[in-house]
């Protein structure tokens, strides 16, 4: 995602920048993941660069497998200010540990796949002895 160059952007612009549908952006707002944003004279949502940066972080948490319930909890703590720094650090540390375990698990899976691919390539490269039916 890129930073907003003007003061505010619409929900459609944020959707295009982030790849998140307007419906999902409204859902995140209703769930407290995104804070309620200001509205223009026309009643449309107006997102500021800070909102874009926060959404980018939320999407990173989501991409790394943090459940929405935990993201919501983190957003609630964030909204309470600096007095919640330690609980936020703890949440992120726990999530980082889970992520490291998942990375290790996926790395092991990738090694198994690599071994299987190597075995198949050896079989493909090895000349096959003709069978009796093929010789006839």
Residue map of PLM features:
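Basic helix-turn-helix/winged-helix DNA-binding cores
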Residues: 1-73
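C-terminal regulatory/oligomerization modules of transcriptional regulators
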Residues: 1-6, 80-136
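Short, charged, low-complexity amphipathic alpha-helix
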Residues: 72-82
